[in-house]
Amino acid sequence: VKKIHFLYTLPFLFFLSCKNEKKDSIAETKVPEISQVEKTDSLVTARIDSAQVPTALKYKGNFKDGFRWKDKTGEYVVVTSETGVYINENFTHENDGSDAEVFAQCYSLENNQQIWKVNDFIKDCMVDIDAAFKKNSLSVTDLDKNGVAEIWAMYEMACKGDVSPSDLKIIMYEGKQKFAMRGETKIRTGMESHGKPVFEGGSYTFDKAFKKGPKAFRDYAEKLWSKNMGE
């Protein structure tokens, strides 16, 4: 079955989903409890739950995970969300199939501007749909110690009616620079005659940004991949 999915990343000036100016101040939201805060030499981060998402930050679907952080460029919040399987009336449907979307949105807490947005989706799928972030894969780091945070999100996408790997992706942003790692989940497909399990998938490729970026980025990405590539 052919897998159909698309990926959009929108810069902060492109407000397809945020056409109306928000009156609420994102910075007025409740600050996470101090026990949740992690500090390094260049970064202060705190995982947030759905109740701590600023009221001015509107997201589609169900809250999955979130972080608030401060680096040398300012203070920010990121939220990941999933729609689950549904029908998006804005999509073209030729097969009377279903849709599913995942979102990651980063906002500045200083001026309420959207810094970047990731929207990946499956559309018009007649079989099983998988569009979900990997649990606890959202993270905020400063691996190159330059004072600018790296934001990591990992998710899988599939439209399939058989036992086969799903598409797997890691999207990372440092400021407005996007890095992408793409491949497949690793699944067990059977057993050899002497009892050894047989696996399929698990491979990946780095985009140009990752290849040209610091080795620390690739090392972290590979560890994240190895930890979460199973279905």
Give the ranges of each region predicted by the language model.
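Short consensus segments that form the blades of beta-propeller domains
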Residues: 87-98, 127-130, 158-164
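Repeat-based blade/solenoid architectures
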Residues: 57-64, 125-138
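Positively charged n-region of N-terminal signal peptides that target proteins for export
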Residues: 1-5, 19-20
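Acidic/hydrophobic-patterned starts of short beta strands in beta-sheet-rich repeat architectures
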Residues: 75-80, 145-155
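Acidic, divalent-cation-chelating loop motifs in proteins
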Residues: 138-146
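C-terminal motif of bacterial Sec signal peptides marking the signal peptidase cleavage site
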Residues: 15-17
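Acidic, small-residue rich beta-repeat scaffolds with periodic aromatic anchors
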Residues: 21-73, 168, 173-231
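Beta-propeller blade signature
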Residues: 100-108, 167-175
